Amino acid sequence: MSATGLGPVRCAFVLLLALCSRPASSQDCSAPCQCPAGPAPRCPAGVSLVLDGCGCCRVCAKQLSELCTERDPCDPHKGLFCDFGSPANRKIGVCTAKDGAPCVFGGTVYQSGESFQSSCKYQCTCLDGSVGCVPLCSVDVRLPSPDCPFPRRVKLPGKCCEEWVCDEPKEHTVVGPALAAYRPEDTFGPDPTMIRANCLVQTTEWSACSKTCGMGISTRVTNDNAFCRLEKQSRLCMVRPCEADLEENIKKGKKCIRTPKISKPIKFELSGCTSMKTYRAKFCGVCTDGRCCTPHRTTTLPVEFKCPDGEVMKKSMMFIKTCACHYNCPGDNDIFESLYYRKMYGDMA
């Protein structure tokens, strides 16, 4: 092989030697904690913000097949660990996935722990046979307002995500009178308690839980904030545990059990993290005649989760007060599932 051909090989070999011969203080935890000043780093979509392996600073977790050290840990929420190879060389490793089932998505096989972009709009991760995706584009909602009566999303050349634009007002349209009627009036206006500082507070009902069992997500849209801007809020929800066999609790002669009693308090789990408190939560039951039972009255409370790395995160979570059993049941994998569920009333938050 010519000297020219050996050039890239020699450079790669020198780089490998440099990585392996770096001082251990940059990888192990013998050095004192020195975190960068300022706010915590902002991680790319789908990448967890975790404490480093020394418990000092918040860092963006390393992903599958990336180099890792004791100070630069792998993403624990994706089942990754740092494989250092031989115990004699515990300085630099490679992020490796724990044993888990692969995923098939779009005709491509992905290993457990592997991240990929299904399109320019979504970042996805395979975790033990299941694929989860987070949007890369904004999912905000914008209603007509006096300063922007005709908002609409448009696809701009060279950009993947659609963006909001405000068209110029047009005469003799339906939107103009609608805006006038939308503003509060002394006699026929909305509840005065919902008006503050030129802002008509609007909040939608919470959507149905994204999962019929296990931990899911429920969302709503509100402008109840300092800037009176519409924003999407989310909360965790669990209609019922997946492992519970509720049909055996149905009394003889009955076809449904609406709110089964849980024998003992439980702790919730989220991405490997566990709630710090135990909860005697209510769940919705099941029917044997084709009806489904869903939350009817709920409330929203904060729940603190503690992760294996010591990080504590606080999440809003739905707690069920009452359930209703009905025939408006969605089909399996129905993307319009929330349209079939009855609305949830009396939510306190």
Swiss-Prot record:
<feature type="disulfide bond">
    <location>
        <begin position="273"/>
        <end position="307"/>
    </location>
</feature>
<dbReference type="InterPro" id="IPR000867">
    <property type="entry name" value="IGFBP-like"/>
</dbReference>
<feature type="domain" description="TSP type-1">
    <location>
        <begin position="198"/>
        <end position="243"/>
    </location>
</feature>
<dbReference type="GO" id="GO:0035988">
    <property type="term" value="P:chondrocyte proliferation"/>
</dbReference>
<dbReference type="GO" id="GO:0045597">
    <property type="term" value="P:positive regulation of cell differentiation"/>
</dbReference>
<feature type="disulfide bond">
    <location>
        <begin position="29"/>
        <end position="54"/>
    </location>
</feature>
<dbReference type="GO" id="GO:0005794">
    <property type="term" value="C:Golgi apparatus"/>
</dbReference>
<feature type="signal peptide">
    <location>
        <begin position="1"/>
        <end position="26"/>
    </location>
</feature>
<feature type="disulfide bond">
    <location>
        <begin position="43"/>
        <end position="60"/>
    </location>
</feature>
<dbReference type="InterPro" id="IPR006207">
    <property type="entry name" value="Cys_knot_C"/>
</dbReference>
<dbReference type="GO" id="GO:0032330">
    <property type="term" value="P:regulation of chondrocyte differentiation"/>
</dbReference>
<dbReference type="GO" id="GO:0010629">
    <property type="term" value="P:negative regulation of gene expression"/>
</dbReference>
<dbReference type="GO" id="GO:0016477">
    <property type="term" value="P:cell migration"/>
</dbReference>
<feature type="domain" description="IGFBP N-terminal">
    <location>
        <begin position="27"/>
        <end position="98"/>
    </location>
</feature>
<feature type="disulfide bond">
    <location>
        <begin position="35"/>
        <end position="57"/>
    </location>
</feature>
<dbReference type="InterPro" id="IPR000884">
    <property type="entry name" value="TSP1_rpt"/>
</dbReference>
<feature type="disulfide bond">
    <location>
        <begin position="256"/>
        <end position="293"/>
    </location>
</feature>
<dbReference type="GO" id="GO:0072593">
    <property type="term" value="P:reactive oxygen species metabolic process"/>
</dbReference>
<dbReference type="GO" id="GO:0001894">
    <property type="term" value="P:tissue homeostasis"/>
</dbReference>
<dbReference type="GO" id="GO:0007165">
    <property type="term" value="P:signal transduction"/>
</dbReference>
<feature type="domain" description="CTCK">
    <location>
        <begin position="256"/>
        <end position="330"/>
    </location>
</feature>
<keyword id="KW-0732">Signal</keyword>
<dbReference type="GO" id="GO:0071897">
    <property type="term" value="P:DNA biosynthetic process"/>
</dbReference>
<dbReference type="GO" id="GO:0008543">
    <property type="term" value="P:fibroblast growth factor receptor signaling pathway"/>
</dbReference>
<dbReference type="GO" id="GO:0001525">
    <property type="term" value="P:angiogenesis"/>
</dbReference>
<dbReference type="GO" id="GO:0046330">
    <property type="term" value="P:positive regulation of JNK cascade"/>
</dbReference>
<keyword id="KW-0237">DNA synthesis</keyword>
<feature type="domain" description="VWFC">
    <location>
        <begin position="101"/>
        <end position="167"/>
    </location>
</feature>
<feature type="region of interest" description="Heparin-binding">
    <location>
        <begin position="247"/>
        <end position="349"/>
    </location>
</feature>
<feature type="disulfide bond">
    <location>
        <begin position="287"/>
        <end position="325"/>
    </location>
</feature>
<dbReference type="InterPro" id="IPR012395">
    <property type="entry name" value="IGFBP_CNN"/>
</dbReference>
<comment type="function">
    <text>Major connective tissue mitoattractant secreted by vascular endothelial cells. Promotes proliferation and differentiation of chondrocytes. Is involved in the stimulation of osteoblast differentiation and has a critical role in osteogenesis. Mediates heparin- and divalent cation-dependent cell adhesion in many cell types including fibroblasts, myofibroblasts, endothelial and epithelial cells. Enhances fibroblast growth factor-induced DNA synthesis.</text>
</comment>
<dbReference type="InterPro" id="IPR001007">
    <property type="entry name" value="VWF_dom"/>
</dbReference>
<dbReference type="Pfam" id="PF19035">
    <property type="entry name" value="TSP1_CCN"/>
</dbReference>
<dbReference type="GO" id="GO:0031012">
    <property type="term" value="C:extracellular matrix"/>
</dbReference>
<dbReference type="GO" id="GO:0030324">
    <property type="term" value="P:lung development"/>
</dbReference>
<dbReference type="InterPro" id="IPR050941">
    <property type="entry name" value="CCN"/>
</dbReference>
<dbReference type="GO" id="GO:0005178">
    <property type="term" value="F:integrin binding"/>
</dbReference>
<dbReference type="GO" id="GO:0007229">
    <property type="term" value="P:integrin-mediated signaling pathway"/>
</dbReference>
<keyword id="KW-1015">Disulfide bond</keyword>
<dbReference type="GO" id="GO:0005615">
    <property type="term" value="C:extracellular space"/>
</dbReference>
<dbReference type="InterPro" id="IPR006208">
    <property type="entry name" value="Glyco_hormone_CN"/>
</dbReference>
